[in-house]
Amino acid sequence: MQIDIVQIVGLGLIATFLSLIVKEQKPTFAFLIVVFAGCAIFLYLVDQIYDIIRMIEKIAINANVNMVYVETILKIIGIAYIAEFGAQLTKDAGQGAIASKIELAGKILILVMAVPILTVIIETILGLIPSMS
């Protein structure tokens, strides 16, 4: 399914317009419109995300890269996007403090997942440096 940016922007603008109209009478309902629009846009893009993941996996297989590293990097990217999405929704609800905690949790989880890759990179670099003894 081909996604057009005009459709995504249109959905976002319609949701924004509806949210602004409803916000005066029912602020909670206005927030739900925003959440629904955000989720709809994300779901609209799932096929493209899937295609990108498959393409990256094919490139990694052709380049003879260990799939554990590729999967870890894809998980890290997923954590970053999900944390950003959750933080933005929380900010939209006026809860900046909670949003910052979501962002912090995402950063910590990314760091935890990156440690094995960083370890391999450091070991590889150290293996390339001639020993001084």
From Swiss-Prot:
Keywords, sorted A to Z? Cell membrane, Membrane, Sporulation, Transmembrane, Transmembrane helix
Q: Which residues form a coiled coil?
A: none
| Chain ranges passing through the membrane | 2-22, 29-49, 108-128
Q: Which GO BP terms, alphabetically?
A: sporulation resulting in formation of a cellular spore
Q: Where in the cell is it found?
A: Cell membrane
Cellular component aspect of the GO annotation = plasma membrane
Q: Which InterPro entries match?
A: Spore_III_AC/AD (IPR025664), Spore_III_AD (IPR014211)
**Pfam families named among the record's database cross-references:** SpoIIIAC
Q: Where is the signal peptide?
A: none
Record's bilayer topology term: Multi-pass membrane protein
- Main localisation: membrane
Q: Which NCBIfam families match?
A: spore_III_AD (TIGR02849)
- Name of the featured protein: Stage III sporulation protein AD
Q: Which organism is it from?
A: Bacillus subtilis (strain 168)
Source organism phylogeny:
Bacteria, Bacillati, Bacillota, Bacilli, Bacillales
